[in-house]
């Protein structure tokens, strides 16, 4: 029979549990609060009764000092008359302070120590009682010294008289005052816990804060008076101007209606609360527009009256230079306002263009851009910046119908035009884009807006990206999204390898499209999709099976678009040199039909960076603010970018035209980018393509890719020269499994490369040939 363990011998038997301790403490706290409430209910009436008895005290009432049967006038009755008489005879006028002192001390004692942690810092009840008694003694003594009267009850009472007489006999009047004052301060500290030094410090801070406050008030008053004088002066000028305008002929200024960005169906769906969380009707790969910040209400630009005044001022400024013009229209936008002027006969456009800086100085604005030709009109445009510039949010562009109705998966939301309408562009029609501008002009923000535009339009099955970021700051935030072909490239040697892989991929796609009989990537994907829907998928015409592995032809898969982002093209040109320029030129010349597109950005728009070879193959360009007309001509082949305002203000040169369009780029915050990136990371795992950044690159059939992107030979990449051969050999000998899928999974490489590694091991005698069931035996001993 098992021996029963006594309660004392059990571990922690004598220790209360945490739950029990909490229960006991909570019970005690509840009892303490209940007791405090009861004491407060009892003390409050007593103090009120005592105060009322003191205020209604009468000498004629019978009490301690006077007996009789007269009528009691005290509101507290006989007891109140007795108590008031005793207190006045004993303490004098200090009797009025006694209920107040008792009330203050009681309140501090009851409500000053709710938390147990503060219990040790509060005074004990005995000390509080000593403080109250000391307060009565000190107060009665002070009252007796300074309010001495023949009637004892009118001064400090009997107590004050006895205290002062005793102290004066030994210390005199001066010493008695000091002693009584010291006793008063100590008593107040004991009774209430008040720190006199802390009180003096607070008073000092208040006193020191008074002079700055007075100075600030005086300064505000002066500013208000100055503003009032300015308002009165403006009123006088306005009256004079109104009289002058009344004498002139009225001018017509055509103001277009305020553009309204119509929301797309996708934007309306994203604003609705889904029935099931995590469900996206357009596919879980596309992020929701709710991840972006909503546009905020902003102050508009010029008012109608200001536009009329500016129109008159423009005409007067041109008259100063002996040029007659007439303002016939004004078109306010979110950032600038375009005034359309009609010059007089015989006035050349070059005369007006040469006066852009003089007009800007005369109008007191930062810059003025002259639009020499406006299609469809015989007027000249004069673009003047608004006083209040509106911020354009990317969410407003992506919610527009212009962006949503664009059928292309490569739709870029660039910003808004001068009229406030969304401007979108199709990268597939460009087919490549060159972005240039000085530091701080908004170039990097625009690149981020382009990236997000693509991410909100196409999933990782339809679009893959290769990002090259020499500065390691702008594009590295997109690390880990499923759209990337490889990790964000920061090493320029790896950048050259990535571009070389893209050239080889372009050549491979052209071979596929030629074998299938289509002219572009859209036709190829359509033909593959139609074949799959018909139940007869197309086989890969470039597939070369290995007879030893018993491989079968693979069906063709849909090919995604590839967009290559290079954030700082000039740095890469300086490090790598001509080799990169040749690779980019090859991609720019031929990659359009293969679905590979380039977006190049640089902050150094010089001729040694933006070479003639690159400009000839990239006709679509965006120029942000630059420092000189020479830089503007380097980018756009014409001036104008030097007059931009910065912060996203750009000139967009569409493909097939020589007339740049002014666009105000959208702002993208870092928080928005991080939210979208986190959503994409959670929606799908990273799917890097093997070998994109390798120094030795091979195609699926084992052909080595040369420095120019062309295949060189068919002898490399499948034997011991593979850089991953030693690692694969170690995995096989350690795990004792010669499985292609195991090597593929452990090394994160493609199936064909893993199969070539296993085949190389078979040639070297590490593994046996495949048996009838496909298994291989590991012949080499395990590593020691």
UniProtKB/Swiss-Prot annotation:
Keywords recorded for this protein, A-Z: ATP-binding, Cell cycle, Cell division, Cell inner membrane, Cell membrane, Chromosome partition, DNA-binding, Membrane, Nucleotide-binding, Transmembrane, Transmembrane helix
Binding sites annotated in the UniProt record for ATP: 440-445
GO cellular component, one term: plasma membrane
Coiled coil: none
InterPro entries, per the entry: AAA+_ATPase, FtsK/SpoIIIE/SftA, FtsK_4TM, FtsK_alpha, FtsK_dom, Ftsk_gamma, P-loop_NTPase, WH-like_DNA-bd_sf
Location relative to the cell: Cell inner membrane
GO biological process: cell division; chromosome segregation
Molecular-function GO term, any one: ATP binding
Topology class, membrane: Multi-pass membrane protein
Occurrences of domain FtsK (ranges): 420-633
A family per Pfam: FtsK_4TM
Statement: the UniProt record of this protein carries the keyword Chloroplast: no
Transmembrane domains' residue ranges: 38-58, 68-88, 92-112, 129-149, 178-198
Residues in the Cytoplasmic compartment per record: 199-784
Domain comment, as recorded: Consists of an N-terminal domain, which is sufficient for the localization to the septal ring and is required for cell division, followed by a linker domain, and a C-terminal domain, which forms the translocation motor involved in chromosome segregation. The C-terminal domain can be further subdivided into alpha, beta and gamma subdomains. The alpha and beta subdomains multimerise to produce a hexameric ring, contain the nucleotide binding motif and form the DNA pump.
General function of this protein: Essential cell division protein that coordinates cell division and chromosome segregation. The N-terminus is involved in assembly of the cell-division machinery. The C-terminus functions as a DNA motor that moves dsDNA in an ATP-dependent manner towards the dif recombination site, which is located within the replication terminus region. Translocation stops specifically at Xer-dif sites, where FtsK interacts with the Xer recombinase, allowing activation of chromosome unlinking by recombination. FtsK orienting polar sequences (KOPS) guide the direction of DNA translocation.
Family: Belongs to the FtsK/SpoIIIE/SftA family.
Assembly notes: Homohexamer. Forms a ring that surrounds DNA.
Name by which UniProt lists this protein: DNA translocase FtsK
Lineage of the organism: Bacteria, Pseudomonadati, Pseudomonadota, Gammaproteobacteria, Lysobacterales
Gene: ftsK
